[in-house]
Amino acid sequence: MTPDLQLALELAEKAGKLTLDYFGRRSLQVFSKRDDTPVTEADRNAEELIRQGISAKFPDDGLFGEEFDEHPSGNGRRWIIDPIDGTRSFIHGVPLYGVMIALEVEGAMQLGVINFPALGELYQAERGSGAFMNGSPVQVSAIAENSASTVVFTEKEYLLDPPSNHPVDQLRIDAGLVRGWGDCYGHMLVASGRAEVAVDKIMSPWDCAAVIPIVEEAGGCCFDYRGRQSIIDGEGLVSANNAMGRNLIAAIGNGERDR
């Protein structure tokens, strides 16, 4: 295990334990950010813990997180942090939130760690080394038929938006099972072979950075609503097993050419 991955795992576990001290509290303090999304004291304290741990070990590395200003990199390495992905779930006592840490090196995601402390599930991946949950390898499913697939989503707009011919939107009709197990948990269901497609129509870099290496090292793929696999600044995030991902990307490409 590289020092980078070891540090990410240690900090994700420490931050996860911190969040559990707040999880389920009726007295939890919730604030509104400028974009009207919620943030809690647990979000801020967890990100501070992670930032301090990284800076102590790698002081020249960049830091880019959801809750605080970016600290620029001096060496091409940038850590991307989402201290609590699924803050709304966290606030309501739903255990499907995750602590996310990723390392980007020269613009490419090198590793990702996602800890679900309330579930006891810890995912990790480093480029070329496979993906793991609690130390055991995980792999995407081989299901290729829409009718046999499980599709999960985060935002209610996925179901409520007007009918669309977009291949990803069409899955809400064609899939065998559609459920709202969203945020990073949905993407880890894909990585571990328990779902075939996860859809996020609204996405920020910290929401997807750790997801990408884990899904890809598990044999899956990540792309945006235009079928592009360069998605940090893309239009949403779709993760899928390899079979369905290839089909969706091809169908999106055909639709783009027909416009």
Curated annotation (Swiss-Prot):
Superkingdom of the source species: Bacteria
Binding, substrate: E66, I84, D85, G86, T87, D207
Keyword Ribonucleoprotein in record: no
Reactions performed catalytically: L-histidinol phosphate + H2O = L-histidinol + phosphate
Binding-site list for Mg(2+) 2: D82, D85, D207
GO terms classed as biological process: inositol metabolic process; L-histidine biosynthetic process; phosphatidylinositol phosphate biosynthetic process; signal transduction
Pathway: Amino-acid biosynthesis; L-histidine biosynthesis; L-histidine from 5-phospho-alpha-D-ribose 1-diphosphate: step 8/9
Cofactor(s) named in the record: Mg(2+)
Key words, A-Z: Amino-acid biosynthesis, Histidine biosynthesis, Hydrolase, Magnesium, Metal-binding
The keyword Protein biosynthesis is assigned to this record: no
Sections of the chain in a coiled coil: none
E.C. number(s) listed in UniProt: 3.1.3.15
One of the record's GO molecular function terms: histidinol-phosphatase activity
InterPro entries: His_9_proposed, Inositol_monoP_metal-BS, Inositol_monophosphatase-like, Inositol_monophosphatase_CS
Binding residues annotated for Mg(2+) 1, in chain numbering: E66, D82, I84
Functional description taken from the UniProt entry: Catalyzes the dephosphorylation of histidinol-phosphate to histidinol, the direct precursor of histidine.
Family (UniProt): Belongs to the inositol monophosphatase superfamily.
Protein name: Histidinol-phosphatase
Organism in which the protein naturally occurs: Chlorobaculum parvum (strain DSM 263 / NCIMB 8327)
